[in-house]
Amino acid sequence: MSKKPNKKQAGAAVHCAHDRLALVTELRPHPKNPNQHPPEQVALLAKIIAHQGWRAPVVVSKRSGFIVAGHGRLAAAVALGLERVPVNDQEFESDADELAHLAADNRIGELAETDGALLKDLLLELDTGAFDMDLSGFDAGELERVINSF
């Protein structure tokens, strides 16, 4: 995997390590992907990618050729009209290993526990009036709830 920092591709900087820049039209979403990406999530992710560039590549299995991580990032790239996305091609020992990674990729993040006080401090530090708070991933109602809860 190579590091190609700050390389612009169709309007989004690439800051993550990746093997290649693939055409979005050549990438194949995994037919067994259980995660759905609602329009609101895709729009928010697109806004973050447009502002910050790519911080994580789309992961493609060398075994099947399907995406195993990054379906939402691909949807955001399509929404932005990007032609190419950074891709990390990975080997999987078996179909079962590939499917387990597909399932675990998002599930592991869901199992994290949030320290509300630290989150509040972090969000208050960002909220200077000069920063677009949408880029934190929280909408105005969620921000208010977090700040008032801790």
Model-derived features: positions:
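Short, charged/polar connector segments at secondary-structure boundaries
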Residues: M1-F150
